[in-house]
């Protein structure tokens, strides 16, 4: 769910860009995009928090958080820009189910907070 928006930020679903607004739901295959003055904060149901800086693009490829069914997945690619990550419950319950990809490598997330920047 979108928790914070500054400037131009968008949630892209099936190729359709919608201006991000507080309370907007983010689905497992959405892209998150910010322009030059944009910033976007998103919190997922496991309490993982992502903050995108200006000129950023995050491509979501998988998200599942179903502890009772033992189904966990979080995969995304930071194609450009900056991202602050604060881990939620998924990294406690299934750390190997979480991965952040960049054009330069993969970050395995095991219960932490970090900032990553991709220059393209």
What are the functions of these language-model segments?
Residues 1-31, 36-39, 44-120:
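Flexible, surface-exposed loop/linker segments and immediately adjacent secondary-structure boundaries
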């Amino acid at each position: 769910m979108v928790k914070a928006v500054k400037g131009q930020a968008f949630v892209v679903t099936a190729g359709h860009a919608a201006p991000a607004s507080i309370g907007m739901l983010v689905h497992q295959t959405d892209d998150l995009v910010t322009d030059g003055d944009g910033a976007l904060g998103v919190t997922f149901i496991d309490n993982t928090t992502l903050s995108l800086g200006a000129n950023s693009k995050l491509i979501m490829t998988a998200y599942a958080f179903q502890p009772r069914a033992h189904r966990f997945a979080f995969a995304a690619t930071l194609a450009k820009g900056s991202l602050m990550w604060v881990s939620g419950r998924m990294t406690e319950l299934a750390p190997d189910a979480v991965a952040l990809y960049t054009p330069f490598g993969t970050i395995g997330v095991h219960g932490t907070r970090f900032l990553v920047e991709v220059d393209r």
